[in-house]
Amino acid sequence: MPDQSINLAIVVAEFNYDITYLMLQRAIAHAKFLGANVKVVFKVPGSYDMAIAVKELLKRDDIDAVVTLGAVIKGETKHDEIVATQTARKILDLSVEYGKPVTLGIIGHGVTHEQAVERIEEYSTRAVEAAIKLAKRLRELRKIQTLNEEMVVIE
């Protein structure tokens, strides 16, 4: 029987690395706990730079889902809003384009450094859980050849 575990890639921003490093450690540990394989950790300078790395990882047949991890801290301008909004939009577009989950483990916008620290565990573990759940459910859906009159629930 072939291995049914989920192969993940994690794209992590180096900006605010005191936060994202801890997010990465939590994400790797949680993926292992849930039985998934982290095949690639790809570091990018900042959250805004994630899209190109995500795209390259989604092209790979040996990657089932991509988890993104970042922290976009509020500054004196609206720069954090632009970064967070555009990053989220683009990675969602890539997920739909490639038919693979890309989950949003990016803290912000509008958060302080202290608020971001408080959210490390929640954002990293939820992003991993969502990636694994969605990859497994998509795998099950794609196995179904024909839908008959009975309702199918994939969970």
Swiss-Prot record:
Q: What residues form the catalytic site here?
A: H79 (proton donor)
A single GO CC term for this protein reads: riboflavin synthase complex
Keyword Metal-binding among record annotations? no
A Pfam short name: DMRL_synthase
- Can you list the disulfide-bonded cysteine pairs? none
Keyword Transferase part of the UniProt annotation: yes
What is one Gene Ontology biological process annotated in the Swiss-Prot or TrEMBL record?
A: riboflavin biosynthetic process
Q: Which SUPFAM superfamilies match?
A: Lumazine synthase (SSF52121)
Enzyme Commission number(s): 2.5.1.78
Sites binding 5-amino-6-(D-ribitylamino)uracil sit at F15, S47, Y48, D49, A71, V72, I73, L104
| Pathway, per record | Cofactor biosynthesis; riboflavin biosynthesis; riboflavin from 2-hydroxy-3-oxobutyl phosphate and 5-amino-6-(D-ribitylamino)uracil: step 1/2
What does the UniProt keyword field contain? Answer: Riboflavin biosynthesis, Transferase
What InterPro entries has UniProt attached to this entry? LS (IPR034964), LS/RS (IPR002180), LS/RS_sf (IPR036467)
Q: Which reaction is this enzyme known to catalyze?
A: (2S)-2-hydroxy-3-oxobutyl phosphate + 5-amino-6-(D-ribitylamino)uracil = 6,7-dimethyl-8-(1-D-ribityl)lumazine + phosphate + 2 H2O + H(+)
Checking Gene3D superfamilies in the record gives: Lumazine/riboflavin synthase
- Its biological purpose: Catalyzes the formation of 6,7-dimethyl-8-ribityllumazine by condensation of 5-amino-6-(D-ribitylamino)uracil with 3,4-dihydroxy-2-butanone 4-phosphate. This is the penultimate step in the biosynthesis of riboflavin.
Q: Which NCBIfam families match?
A: lumazine-synth
Q: Which family does it belong to?
A: Belongs to the DMRL synthase family.
Name of the protein: 6,7-dimethyl-8-ribityllumazine synthase
Taxonomic source organism:
Sulfurisphaera tokodaii (strain DSM 16993 / JCM 10545 / NBRC 100140 / 7) (Sulfolobus tokodaii)
What is the gene name?
ribH
